[in-house]
């Protein structure tokens, strides 16, 4: 082959006049000739320790290698003279190299050059390359593409690559895609497995193990099989996989494998060593350590308390250093800190305190960003990934060379490090509390886009080369830019190449690892930028982006002070970058954090992936060497019975699709490690039906993989090859594949006496007469999908009412009739997108559920007809309700709490922020046990003084309202104690408002499971116990279906399922809202500490915990009573939305007010006040003028108490009651004085008439319903529930071979649950699923049909129930319609509205 000019000159410079392989030899190595040198302009990286050389170092006169003086003796590489300067400085592209990438070039002997390895990665050959195909070994190929190739050319190269592979290996190759999914990869290649993860990141250990196992399975199946590793961008992914497989294969390697191991090591050193990130090296070391057995696993829980970050004043000289942290667990966002600002020079270290402590388990990634001066951009400071079970001390330190991005950043000092402080309990670390310098302030306005963006939520959710639709867009920023990237799909002309050059190519040479080839192309002219989008295009973008992309007139301009952002950011005119939160669309119900907006419920994509934040981040040329350790492996077993599993399993961090199995034994099972120790109920948080949000609602699960080692049995691992240990992780047990840290060290706790208390940043608004709580009717979408509880404004909930007499809602700390966090059944009561549209959101009224879950107070009709839906408020985050130990076990069937009735998908980006309340957080993160002694012993009248412990929240010290702990009932006293007015001897639970809640003596949920809250059934009452003495409608106490035998009363034949029945006989009601946390009251005793949630938010409590011993329920607390008459139950409505507050107050007199929980700032409150005239700055109002007179103010919480934010004249108050009392005397900064109400404003709203032909849910459930259906199959969904579980089961049933044979079964729904009877006894005789085990029911979200033998199709539906014997795993039972008169929608509606709704 005739060489081109530059190549020929390069060969001549290296002393190889003849390019023949037989005669070519590198010149003799010479020793280095070092001399001292001061590096001023450009500081190089030390060739030994890979750390930037600051100041003086040594440099070789010949080869120019630089190192520290102390590292001079450690230099191992030989001295090689550099090529001619013209080649070192040449950046012109080589025009062509004939037949590169073709079969001929791969087999040509001259193509395998023997360049020394020291030149194989030299950046001197900076030419544009399109494909680097290397034979790592004879059976492992590596195909690398640049990060941003021209799409049209890239497709051509993929076709050429497929042709080369097909011609040389036929169908004997398996392609592993390590980047984003692509349609053309699947079309062009016979077998493709998708194992993608973000660029420059380390893959989780389970994915690493899965890839190695899949490679071994494929290569061992046939001697002619080969593996092709495909990636785009950085070749670090190739290095990670090749290194991991090198360690993996050495376990069973013989003498014949030694050469393959050597060539893999050479490949890593030659081709990818300098592109490996520190976290990638660390995970390779984890993997090798796990394989070698040199790991000492840490099985204790790990709570993160503090993170110490170095202060980098030179990071951005103009704005200073403004860091904030994001913490991910299994690539799911679990914590976002506030933005720290350093006023002046002085502090060298910043302490970021997490209160309460954050429980971490498994793969953890911590990213530190710097918030730009504009407030709309952010820059990555460092990123570090580690695994928790490798941590064995209280302190974990990462020096600069172990931090991604920072290791090559000159602004990051060499001596700086990042430090994490852990403990084994959520209690505060004993000793000196670290404090920040007084010059450090914190901004907790984490709703800003630059802080809230999560760059990983949408990775691989769509194919990279997807061409469906006229527009392709990324749903969210990738690199911290404030705008989503929206691009036209090229139609006729090829797209312009990316203006940013790809990374420097590697010389495609491998001296001892086989063939190599590189495709090179000439630089093409850059095409001019596209014109700005037209109006039609903007309208289309607005539809695609859910109202997040087009600026419109927002109503935020009329507010008095910009206390809350209301998600209004200036949009960028022109171009395709559209402002994310630039305005509001009138028709939008809320914004979803996935930035997708409205989308047809066309199904859930297979797989939930995250988008790499590093895709568009600046990248520096990496330095450093490859470190590998010869150690053992952990295998990700493949199981036949799980090949049919769908991949729409919620937030599996990297669950790839199944691909095409090569044979019956090969297929990729989704990654087995899932975080299951902290199980949360997904609930139905918000009105968003986009697939990304729906997938986020599912809970992860865990699986243990067996190790193929001789010592496995002794270590508790399965020694049977290929058989996975699929055990759910139990509390207190270590997660699988937990391996020790590499490159970081542990040290004892430091002395933090030198640190100083933090200064809480405040946003002061001078000269304001109004401090508006501008949360907006739209709210924001940064709330955790896994833990929030749904409440939709106009979407009603269904909660059977036993009595309808109006009654007061009680004080703020009472137990309301809302879903209890611990026993909340995931997605219970919700209707999948495939269900009939029962709801007309804008035509429905509202009503507020009282504390017993029975008495409803419908709001005025304006609530549903004016303005955006009230449900646009973001859901109440459950960290207010119980942030630890939540279980996915179903709620008790006797818990008449409400559940939302429509498919409300939660946000796909769970934002877990720290609130402004920092400091004196109550540290007893414990479960509380309700004692039955309080209610039976004393009844309090409305005007009677309450115990201080119970009334502590009625006094409204807001910091105490942090999170309600999961509670467990002690069943033993219930059988012996009977409270006055409690029928059937059921005990009664005292609530602060003077009410008594009857609790069921029989809890069907086990009380021994940690973190499980037993929500008591609010039993019937025949006496009045409302504050105003109004009688409650009595309910018959004869309810054999609730207290009798498991079988329902056999009074009459079971009717069919009603087709058009309204299951709520008591008028429209408000959707369910979670409880506020209150302190363990009198008569309650703390149970062992529960685990923290996956989500995290910090609060503070200026008062100590008030946990009284159970022996003294009331006596010790009377002295602390401060209020003779508590009026907070009249004005504190924590669960009201903004629109509901407006509807209640717009017709009131000036001075009428309500206080509710802020839905934009956790821990804060919103004050809605009716004023006489609108403020002068208010803009013209197009709606009801009376609505403009309801103004909103933000009440912030802090260590000093509560105050109205935005006005410096406002003082702090110890409680909300004190604030209200003072402002009722003097308005201070408010427009007028507050008028304390004397009665509940909800009672003044007339009740909606009840049609006489409606059947109550209780009557329907008592009677039951049944019909015949086709039973298809049952599919294990692990911890997955909700519509994703039904979609997964449907996919499994429709894709399994052979197709399951359906059986006709009798399907009966009663108060006890669901009973299936196989009349023909083909599969079983009878199966019963108790109501407490059923968590969800819906039709197939993708509306797929079951094809019967006669060709007719039937709708598929199913219900999700707990797997017997396992508190964490679920099973989805799938059915198809049989009787046309009994459609699936009617069955699902009956289960959802009646069965699941009744038990709440």
Swiss-Prot record:
Keywords recorded for this protein, A-Z: Cell junction, Cell membrane, Cytoplasm, Hydrolase, Lipid-binding, Membrane, Metal-binding, Methylation, Phosphoprotein, Protein phosphatase, SH2 domain, Ubl conjugation, Zinc, Zinc-finger
UniProt membrane topology term: Peripheral membrane protein
InterPro entries: C1-like_sf (IPR046349), C2_domain_sf (IPR035892), PE/DAG-bd (IPR002219), PH-like_dom_sf (IPR011993), Prot-tyrosine_phosphatase-like (IPR029021), PTB (IPR013625), PTB/PI_dom (IPR006020), SH2 (IPR000980)
Active-site residues (renumbered): 231 (phosphocysteine intermediate)
Catalysed reaction equations from the record: O-phospho-L-tyrosyl-[protein] + H2O = L-tyrosyl-[protein] + phosphate
Location of the protein in the cell: Cell junction, Focal adhesion; Cell membrane; Cytoplasm
Top EC class for this record: hydrolase
Top-level taxon in the UniProt lineage: Eukaryota
Biased composition (Polar residues): 433-444, 898-917, 929-940, 1082-1098
Modified residues (Omega-N-methylarginine): 555
Chain positions with Phosphoserine modification: 118, 120, 455, 466, 481, 820, 825, 830, 832, 835, 931, 941, 972, 991, 1003, 1087, 1238
SMART domains assigned: C1, PTB, PTEN_C2, SH2
Induction of the gene: Induced under catabolic conditions in skeletal muscles.
Tissue specificity: In the adult kidney, expressed mainly in glomeruli (at protein level). In the newborn kidney, localizes on the basal surface of podocytes along the glomerular basement membrane and not in endothelial cells. Low expression levels in anabolic skeletal muscles.
Function in brief: Tyrosine-protein phosphatase which regulates cell motility, proliferation and muscle-response to insulin. Phosphatase activity is mediated by binding to phosphatidylinositol-3,4,5-triphosphate (PtdIns(3,4,5)P3) via the SH2 domain. In muscles and under catabolic conditions, dephosphorylates IRS1 leading to its degradation and muscle atrophy. Negatively regulates PI3K-AKT pathway activation. Dephosphorylates nephrin NPHS1 in podocytes which affects mTORC1 complex activity.
Name of this protein: Tensin-2
Organism whose genome encodes this protein: Mus musculus (Mouse)
